[in-house]
Amino acid sequence: MEHTTLEKFKTEVHRTLISKLDLEKLSRVNSSQARQAVAAMVTEILSDQRVPLNFSEQEKIQSDLLDEVFGLGPLEPLLRDPKISDILVNSKDRVFIERGGRLERAEASFRDDRHLLQVIDRIVSRVGRRVDESSPMVDARLPDGSRVNAIIPPLALDGPSL
């Protein structure tokens, strides 16, 4: 399946998943059980859609949606890579990483500015901070010691950056 078509389909599956999720029930189980339950829901949604996907496409959609629900979406694969020392999100579709002292473009991207804003909000809310139009810049230290700097409009002229 073509990349843009796969992304559109993944967005539809994500919407369906969100509408079916019982957050109260998920909050009562451990994270491993919650991940298994959501993975099973994604598998069920994919089979209900009856769209011809090969195994790797199904795995990619499931992995991406689990990262979206339980983590920081498209940043999760980058965060799992121990060789990456820095992640720079200049815009929704311009993500760079530092690996081995070299800056390189990453494959990661966000659906749109709103998606990037949601991920930024998830990150800064973990440390009791907020970022919005009245406070469009945040610089914070995360619990693991890493730093995060986010800028959103109106300060960021080309959309949110992280």
Question: For each predicted feature, which ranges?
Answer:
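N-terminal anchoring/assembly modules that precede and organize ATP-driven motor systems
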Residues: 1-104
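P-loop NTP-binding catalytic core
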Residues: 81, 89, 94-162
